[in-house]
Amino acid sequence: MKGGRFQAPATWFGRREADCAGYINSRSSKTIYQRASVSVDQVKRACRATMVAIALMVLPPRFVAAITAIRLHQSRRDLKEALREALGRDVALVEPGPVPPPELIAATSLMSKSDLQLKSQKHVYLAHSYRSAAWILNMARAAGLTFREGMSIFELGCGEGRLISHLRALPRARLVASDVRADTIKWCRNSLPGIEFHVNELEPPVAFLESNSVDLAIAQSVFTHIPLAWQRAWLEEIARVIRPGGIFWCTIIGQHHIDVMLDKDARQILEETGEFELDGKDPRSSYSTQLIGSWDVFQTEPVVRREFGRYFEIANYQKNPAGPDVLVMRVPPLG
């Protein structure tokens, strides 16, 4: 807006994007992307996310407020569009509910303690959750999932419900979510009506779900923290509850976090064995992992394809240059 409070942030972004555009689209850069199995669009999104993070740290408060307001508006719009594409018609978004207390956010989604103040802000928290919900809907639809009234969705490791709360916009959907933290589930039950919340154990089963009953299962930032010795049991359990033709969407630690979190010796072990873990006592682990005594779990692509491929068809293995990688998998339909 000319003459308004959004002018300076828009100008700042425009100049930074112009600085990056030539390099991002150069022939040599595209060759690098192909070798790394990432797309130009993914790199652009990563660059923009990096610019947003820098802007939120260095710009004056009034500009930060403008940027977060823009991101929230764009994220809500993205979710409405994703719902429209999934259902073939417009549906109203559901009020997301309160922002959880900082101690719950800290236990689920922080790489470092310094992130807490920013990620606890309402606009930032909601923008991220709207965007994640839209991302999952779009990827599940692209993998062949048919969205319909009365479908069933399960989120394992739901944390404070930031993601599944938005899926209440799906007409008459059965929404089920679970987490190992009883305090988190207590907050969810009191704050987010319309969702079945359960406390699950560190190991399966999830006895509250019938076999072949779920259309879409979600595990965001879950298999990034499940010890390798337990992963097969959880994969088998998730495959049990998903109906034939259903979709499993999950994140895993990718090259970005390998480069950021592991030193040379750890990367060498990972390359040789295909697997590596950091427990919460290791200073290299993420802040949330240290806070709750969990694990950060690293796997190479061949190991991921071998282990997850035992139970699912991998429809999409999306590598993220600025965050976790994503797997979109399906249970083969009958016949």
Enumerate the language-model features and the residues they cover:
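Class I SAM-dependent methyltransferase core
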Residues: 155
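A short acidic, Gly/Pro-enriched loop at the edge of an enzyme's catalytic core
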Residues: 207-217
